[in-house]
């Protein structure tokens, strides 16, 4: 299979022939790359890249028709590619405002337990309405909804990976109370904090036997 990747007019295209054509918004790629760089510790200075870049790709990615899954596969292959054209393309994505905005949000929620939109806006230096618009473009969702999701995920990771209690995880992630965290779990995931604790206990026991 022969494919090509290029960036132009805020979109990324990947195609192999006239029968297959995938189109991704560059902001989705920027979000993926920002997460990868942030959590892998790969944040570096990137040089200027051309606005239109292309390269040939030999691997067949047609095994999935899910656009989000396809984007993940492409980005991972691009990140680990040694092709200079690929590196230039990623450098261009790293120059976008969406990329830096996602990094800004990730850094802020790591430093502060409770993040307010007003505070984010003031530090970013734009109006609240414009900030919300930028976030919507970069995140693909409302900024408050996305921040709440990230906070919930961080809380769950504290419980599962760091063996914290529900109470400790709630306090460490800016929840007003344990019940607030518990209600969020129930609303978003469909099971209670007590059930979550039981799941954690069960997983630990299974791992001990293994």
Swiss-Prot record:
Gene3D superfamilies with a match to the protein in the record: Homeodomain-like
Keywords: DNA-binding, Plasmid, Transcription, Transcription regulation, Transport, Virulence
Annotated DNA-binding residue span(s): 118-139, 166-189
InterPro entries hit by this protein: HTH_AraC, HTH_AraC-typ_CS
Pfam families from the UniProt entry: HTH_18
SMART domains in UniProt: HTH_ARAC
Domain HTH araC/xylS-type: start-end pairs: 99-199
Any GO MF annotation of the entry: DNA-binding transcription factor activity
Protein name listed in UniProt: Transcriptional regulator MxiE
């Amino acid at each position: 299979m022969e494919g090509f990747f290029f960036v132009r007019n805020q979109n990324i295209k990947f195609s192999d022939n006239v029968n297959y054509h995938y189109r991704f918004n560059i902001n989705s790629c920027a979000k993926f790359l920002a997460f990868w760089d942030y959590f892998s510790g790969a944040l570096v200075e990137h040089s200027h890249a051309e606005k239109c870049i292309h390269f040939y790709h030999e691997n067949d990615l047609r095994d999935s028709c899910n656009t989000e899954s396809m984007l993940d596969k492409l980005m991972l292959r691009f990140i680990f590619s040694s092709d200079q054209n690929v590196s230039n393309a990623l450098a261009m994505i790293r120059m976008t405002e969406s990329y830096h905005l996602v990094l800004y949000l990730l850094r802020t929620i790591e430093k502060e337990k409770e993040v307010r939109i007003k505070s984010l806006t003031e530090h970013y230096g734009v109006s609240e309405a414009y900030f919300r618009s930028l976030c919507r473009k970069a995140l693909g969702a409302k900024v408050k909804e996305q921040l709440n999701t990230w906070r919930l995920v961080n809380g769950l990771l504290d419980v599962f990976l760091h063996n914290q209690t529900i109470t400790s995880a709630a306090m460490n992630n800016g929840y007003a109370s344990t019940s607030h965290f518990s209600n969020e779990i129930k609303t978003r995931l469909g099971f209670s904090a007590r059930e979550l604790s039981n799941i954690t206990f069960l997983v630990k026991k299974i791992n001990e036997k293994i």
